[in-house]
Amino acid sequence: MDSKYQCVKLNDSHFMPVLGFGTYAPPEVPKSKALEATKLAIEAGFRHIDSAHLYNNEEQVGLAIRSKIADGSVKREDIFYTSKLWCNSHRPELVRPALERSLKNLQLDYVDLYLVHFPVSVKPGEEVIPKDENGKILFDTVDLCATWEAMEKCKDAGLAKSIGVSNFNRRQLEMILNKPGLKYKPVCNQVECHPYFNQRKLLDFCKSKDIVLVAYSALGSHREEKWVDPNSPVLLEDPVLCALAKKHKQTPALIALRYQLQRGVVVLAKSYNEQRIRQNMQVFDFQLTSEDMKTIDGLNRNMRYLTLDIFAGPPNYPFSDEY
């Protein structure tokens, strides 16, 4: 099988490429970079592109996809595109308009996957993180089961081929799975996952329910100071990963990506650097031994880079549970 198109079958029978290109960049990075990087990624062989309303780059990412379709490089059906519903649009009547807005920005007719980005709801409006005059976040109270029903309607309407969630814990997944009248299970749960935070328990739970775990921050994280502790260890400088990279004549990033593929995790690789974008496609060109895998398992320290603790407080904050 052509390595570039290795896919996993989702519980709704659609197929998702196991290696995805992450498009998030900190706000100071010019949006034009998202356009260039996404084009480079498609040229390098990436077929799974991950973005979100929150990233404020869907116009550029959509333009990149459409330009690679226009020049004959790919067809629309070759591309697996993911967008995400932000927390200010959890109210059921706001779900479809939010997706339609993403589609308008993208200039696409449908997304392949639409995710509930984060389980905490904030007040509706233009602001992605609405705050009161004292700088406190304005939370909203929304039943996520009602949000999910609106997501199901988006799938029925053909606006999203598949629907899933992101940053949900086991309890929140079970709440959806046990919902009376559930029409479609989430196809995936996209969460932070890397050798320092390997999500073993959540992965086992997801596998038992035929839900794919998709890894973000698989290479550590963007280390944006607003979100990430600058003193946290740099994953790709880990001596064990560096030693394995040397052994396999690969980069530490490729070791971290390959680790996920071999445990049945779909992995997102985020880079705006042309050389590294091309390099990350080499994840299909080598294999880790079971000893290597055990060694990497041993690096786990249950360390999250993205605690998103500005959202802590409401009962739906997902990271207080063990998993």
Swiss-Prot record:
CDD domains: AKR_AKR1C1-35. The active site is at residue 55. One of its GO terms (biological process) is digestion. Pathway: Steroid metabolism. The record marks 84 as: Lowers pKa of active site Tyr. It is found in: Cytoplasm, Cytosol. NADP(+) binds at residues 20-24, 50, 166-167, 190, 216-222, 270-280. Substrate binds at residues 24, 117, 222, 227. Transmembrane segments: none annotated. It comes from the Eukaryota. Pfam families: Aldo_ket_red (PF00248). Its EC number is 1.1.1.-, 1.1.1.112, 1.1.1.209, 1.1.1.210. Cytosolic aldo-keto reductase that catalyzes the NADH and NADPH-dependent reduction of ketosteroids to hydroxysteroids. Most probably acts as a reductase in vivo since the oxidase activity measured in vitro is inhibited by physiological concentrations of NADPH. Displays a broad positional specificity acting on positions 3, 17 and 20 of steroids and regulates the metabolism of hormones like estrogens and androgens. May also reduce conjugated steroids such as 5alpha-dihydrotestosterone sulfate. Displays affinity for bile acids. This is Aldo-keto reductase family 1 member C1. The lineage of its organism: Eukaryota, Metazoa, Chordata, Craniata, Vertebrata.
